[in-house]
Amino acid sequence: MIAEIADILGDICLLIFVFALIYAICSSVVSDETLYDRTLLASTDPRKLEYFIEPSHDEQPQLFPTIFDEPEVYATFVVPAYNEERRIPSMLNETLQFLDTRRDENPNFSYEIIVVDDGSKDKTAEVVLDFANSHPEIRLLKQPVNMGKGAAVAAGCSHARGQYILMVDADGATKIDEFNELEKKMLQLQQVNREAIVVGSRAHLEGQDKANRTPIRKFLGLSFHLLILLSGVRGINDTQCGFKLFSREASRYLFPNQHIERWCFDPELLVIGRKRKMQIAEVPVEWNEIEGSKMKVTSMIKMAIDLLRIALFHGMGIWTVKLKQAVYDQELI
């Protein structure tokens, strides 16, 4: 009886996989257009990634530099934010306290925080600008429409001034002082290759969570890990933790070549990194689940489809990896 049920479940999974693959193929434009290529759209197109704001005396938007410019600070902290007016103040306060302490201990340490407001409908932008008025290290990159977390991270990292770029979630689920551990690993990796990625990982916490998982959650978890493997990611146990450190050299290839704009962009970055033979490592981090951070079932379905797109389009060579400095220079002259 159990064997029959297992066979039925296997057939169902296979059907879901086939239909999802067909849907992904049919619903996607099969081209090598990346997120940054959209900056070449007309200025009236709301998807255009050219909405950069920072406090200034004349209160006019300021154009950010690009990842292809020389670094101006040691580290950039990119914070994607969508409707985060309530949670982001505590996260920014904690981050500023940590970074200012680092700077007091080492005068050569410099930083910036780029908050990417991804088309928020609340007062996220106003809250961030209030912080920026008293903390010039904070800058706001504002997108007029919601494009997704992946697009927000790509926009922020594409215009970072740091030698090292940390992606960190606005909910503060991962303590900011974990940056020190990722930084240590990054410096080790760069002795081999300047293009490097360090992934914050919650995999060591899985044992604590498994006891509370329902059979459905266990099934979904196993299915997701299978799709991660199919997408081409190997050797990384936790691809989805919102705490990742990138070298500037790696970022010049990662974000200009990114296609996935919503939740499942992380595996694509790792696939791009593997294609470039970057140094990639995983470091355990302290992580606490924050209220309001649960993912919807519809988002999980979309993630599965995006993973199939990554596997198919990168696997077939439709999505390529190349240096796109000319695109940046043309756009920003």
From Swiss-Prot:
Pathway: Protein modification; protein glycosylation. InterPro entries: DPG_synthase, Glyco_trans_2-like, Nucleotide-diphossugar_trans. Belongs to the glycosyltransferase 2 family. GO terms for biological process: protein N-linked glycosylation. PANTHER family: DOLICHYL-PHOSPHATE BETA-GLUCOSYLTRANSFERASE (PTHR10859:SF91), GLYCOSYL TRANSFERASE (PTHR10859). Gene3D superfamilies: Spore Coat Polysaccharide Biosynthesis Protein SpsA, Chain A. This is Dolichyl-phosphate beta-glucosyltransferase ALG5B. It is an enzyme of class 2 (transferase).
